[in-house]
């Protein structure tokens, strides 16, 4: 993939990630003045995850690093705009949730219950379930670590 194609794919990924970020921000009753920042933060998070995955990092670690970036930027923006960091960060990480792997795991579980046990279905179920669980864990831990670092009152050493 050339540089121009990568930049177009990155721009498309960021634009398509901003749409659900704004949608979920509206569901969470985020103030109207913060909607554009939720969209931008969702685009930054999903774009950074795509860059890290393109560079060879797996999806779990890429999601962890991207959610740490989202958490750090969200804390800084909350200081600038006098809002809680969750106003910006929660809606911004929703586009990174593992919908496809969770859905595939669920479908595999339904097929096992209907058709009976088979090793390929069980492998598909466990692989996708563990991937989805790891991504959700990476999102939650990565989103909470910047708050632990930046709001710490005691010295680190």
Swiss-Prot record:
It comes from the Bacteria. It is a multi-pass membrane protein. It is found in: Cell inner membrane. One of its GO terms (cellular component) is plasma membrane. The chain crosses the membrane at residues 8-28, 57-77, 87-107, 129-149. Keywords: Cell inner membrane, Cell membrane, Membrane, Transmembrane, Transmembrane helix, Transport. Its main location: membrane. One of its GO terms (biological process) is succinate transport. Belongs to the ThrE exporter (TC 2.A.79) family. The transporter is composed of YjjB and YjjP. Involved in succinate export with YjjP. Both proteins are required for export. This is Probable succinate transporter subunit YjjB. The lineage of its organism: Bacteria, Pseudomonadati, Pseudomonadota, Gammaproteobacteria, Enterobacterales. The gene is yjjB.
